[in-house]
Amino acid sequence: MLHVALCRTGATLKLSFMIEPLLIAELALLGLTTGFLAGLLGVGGGMVMVPFVTLIMSSRGASSGLAVKMAIATSMATIMFTSISSVRAHHQRGAVRWDIAKRFAPGIVLGSFIGSLGVFALLKGTYLAIFFALFVGFSATQMIRDKKPAAARQLPGNAGLFGFGALIGFLSGLVGAGGAFISVPFMTWCNVHMRNAVATSAALGFPIAVANVIGYVITGRHVMDLPAGSFGYIWLPALGIIALCSVLTAPLGARATHALPVAVLKKVFASILYVLATYMLYRGLAG
């Protein structure tokens, strides 16, 4: 049985989660799953990690609002590790389009800072969540339809990629995901091969994660009711266990990417996008 203890440090009331075998097993299984998804689809597993970490924390005494914020921040922090592991595997196969990643990166960093340093702390995100769900659902539908992009359609110039990168970083920071839910459909729409889009998206996950984590630490440093073992909004025990397990399975997912047919990969990714869209729509409508 898992226990929740309350620890008082000065005027601060902290939740102390005892790390017992069941909790370790829960977090380890979550890490193995999200790591495989990171390698397979270029995602950091945020759509899986955020709801489950929220459930784990809220069931142990954390308020719903705090649990969601810490789940988002902890999810994003693990992406720093899963992205490195999966990108290495993709790079060894020559799948990462570094020329595209370098053009995306400046906008991604700016958008991530705007989201994590400002909007994350202030915005409930009801209307944004609904818009986001509709956008992701549309992207998933386009992938399932497999409508061929115009032969002449190409990626936009540096200004266009900067702006779209800022949008990716901004939205990623609000949901704790690595950005593949937007960047992969966008790149395939612009005639980037699916496997290259997945690999490049995995590379983009690292700057997204680093910039957002900095913001989460800064904005969370003065919050008074964080659980013991927190660094800003990041729950370090969960980060350590999930990250350790996820780096083990990320290379397996990356190898599966290069073994699966592109059509199957698109359907798998679209299915995950629908799950994320449904969850975000629920969060938006529930207020």
Regions found by a protein language model. Give the residues of each.
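Juxtamembrane transmembrane-helix boundary motif
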Residues: 3-41, 48, 52-69, 85-169, ...
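Alpha-helical transmembrane segments of polytopic membrane transporters and translocases
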Residues: 73-77, 203-206
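Hydrophobic alpha-helical transmembrane segments of multi-pass integral membrane proteins
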Residues: 199-217
